Amino acid sequence: MSRYHTFTAADAVEYARQFGQVADPQALVTADEIGDGNLNLVFKIRDTAGISRVIVKQALPYVRCVGESWPLTLDRARIEAETLLTHSQFCPQHTVKVLHHDAELAVMVQEDLSDHHIWRHELIQGNYYPQAAEQLGEYLAQTLFHTSDFYQSAQAKKAAVSRYTNPELCQITEDLFFTDPYIEHERNNFDPVLLPEVLSLRQDKALKLAVASLKHRFLSQAEALLHGDIHSGSIFVADGRLKTIDAEFGFYGPIGFDIGTALGNLLLNYCGLPGLAGPRDAAAGREQRLNDVQTVWQTFAARFLALSQEKAQDPALATEGYAAQFLQHVWRDAIGYCGSELIRRTIGLAHVADLDSIDDQEMRRACQRHALSLGRALILVAPHVDDVGGVVARIRQSPSSLTPQRC
């Protein structure tokens, strides 16, 4: 008989007392449910002084925003905990610390990050963290290299691919990224005024062929252990620090996917800034986002190359020049997945505050149109641009990258 039951606040406190690794467990007395997640219960566990000490996170057996009609496997909690533990093995400074997890209860206790802030909120507010982009690039390089064929033995890698098979969560990604936005589907969510742009995407054969290729690679290329949902809402920042959280979508997939979704969220903020700030601040913020895009990729690529030169285990993959050649393919994937993120976050099920929190309706629509046009352009141009500087130059030169005009 399964031990699983949905935690109450009292259950979360008791669990934290047992497994929170705090000096005085009995000082933990209250639990506040937090977060806007659709897949989990998340509790902040506070002590008698009201200070949050640890986080208790439990997977729900269904998608919360839909209900029990959309069931989900609880094994994703094990996959999330083990993904974070594996990533922490190679990049502890940028991965949230898992203190304990129980696969049967689908629960995890992790360090409290109350002294950090969600990066998306900070980007929207115009608060700049100068080391964040470089730290994100470092995290991506360390985690993706060390779980790839460049570092793992073939036997270990094949076993890991099996252990991290995550079909139900991957199905969500497959549908929301690569299928729903390009067909009429009840999960899609967009302002009816955008229908002409949406229909144009659905009727663009070249775009749909490119998206089909991206989906095929997502389905078939087990290159490294991905976070699987790396965006500015799953990244916490503080002065000089960055931590990733929420890895329940972890699986072995194409390396460019994690990079592309990260870059896509920087560009979603880029698209939304004219509606979030005054003209001068928006222009400065947009330039910084483009610099961040360059920094993330350049840091990732430089570190991945250095790691391959120092640590590549397979003699064939250690061949001089191969890692650089491989990164060209990763780059093209990343730009395609980046474009997919822009489109699906604008007209699909799950939106972002970078666009949706814009108060002025006409400006919001203009920013959404920009995100759609930029996403489409990136998907189509991905096979033809060899470096990040070329992509940034095209964004700067494109009329759609200028401040959106009111409709």
Curated annotation (Swiss-Prot):
One of its GO terms (molecular function) is S-methyl-5-thioribose kinase activity. Its EC number is 2.7.1.100. GO terms for biological process: L-methionine salvage from methylthioadenosine. It comes from the Bacteria. Pathway: Amino-acid biosynthesis; L-methionine biosynthesis via salvage pathway; S-methyl-5-thio-alpha-D-ribose 1-phosphate from S-methyl-5'-thioadenosine (hydrolase route): step 2/2. The keyword Transcription regulation does not apply. Pfam families: APH (PF01636). Keywords: Amino-acid biosynthesis, ATP-binding, Kinase, Methionine biosynthesis, Nucleotide-binding, Transferase. Homodimer. Belongs to the methylthioribose kinase family. This is Methylthioribose kinase. It comes from Yersinia pseudotuberculosis serotype O:3 (strain YPIII).
